Amino acid sequence: MASVILYEYPFNERIRAYLRLEYLFDRLFFFAREGDARLHQIAVSSLFDLLDASERTDIKGAVLQDLERQRMALVGLRDHPGVAQDALEAMLRDMERVVAALAAQGKTGQALRENEWLVSLRGRLAVPGGATQVDMPSYHAWQNKPESVRCADLQSWLAPLLPLHEGLSMALRLLRESGRRADIAAEQGGYQQMLAGKIYHLLRVWVDPSLGVFPEISANKYMVWIRFSTQDGEVKPQQVSRDVAFQMSLCSS
């Protein structure tokens, strides 16, 4: 069991899209490493989910804009007392590399959209039970290829998405690092905080799993509300009336 459980809440749709993509990338990488063909099907489905999610908005452009904004903030720290300049310059060089790789790409996943077999498989997997050997024998044959062949194919299909993954990961890492973790007590299971006009992009909440609660979060540019509830799998979540200790971080970078 995890020592703490982390919950994140986005303040805008751009960060919500980032978190969804991060989740899909994590799922894709996890199942692509496995050897079982049935688990590789989850990896392939995650690949198609990534394509769907990236088609809904200009994720590439948004990530590039965020990285440029974060780069300018880091440049402003040059010669600043207390800042490790060698580490700062290394970060800026790494950021330039990531930005260049992402900017050099065309439309995210375009090569995958032009792969006729993957397009056909994408359509079959969208149908419940549609990828059986009856409906798509070529996919059944692929699933029965050696593990090394399937893994190589998955890595090949992943490759066009790696610049986006690296850019997205860097943007989210810098955003998360901008927050300061604080100990909070939710009296009678509830907590609210005024934001005093400061613009935040992400709220992070850490909860001890032994408490048996989870946060239900809502927020706008003026205030954050957190209400802790329990869930036993049988009925809808029930709000708790006891005090709950947790940690919170507001991220604005």
From Swiss-Prot:
Its main location: cytoplasm. It is found in: Cytoplasm. It comes from the Bacteria. Coiled coil: none annotated. Keywords: Cell cycle, Cell division, Cytoplasm, Septation. One of its GO terms (biological process) is division septum assembly. GO terms for cellular component: cell division site; cytoplasm. InterPro entries: ZapD, ZapD_C, ZapD_sf. Interacts with FtsZ. Belongs to the ZapD family. PANTHER family: CELL DIVISION PROTEIN ZAPD. Cell division factor that enhances FtsZ-ring assembly. Directly interacts with FtsZ and promotes bundling of FtsZ protofilaments, with a reduction in FtsZ GTPase activity. HAMAP family: ZapD. This is Cell division protein ZapD. It comes from Bordetella pertussis (strain Tohama I / ATCC BAA-589 / NCTC 13251). The gene is zapD.
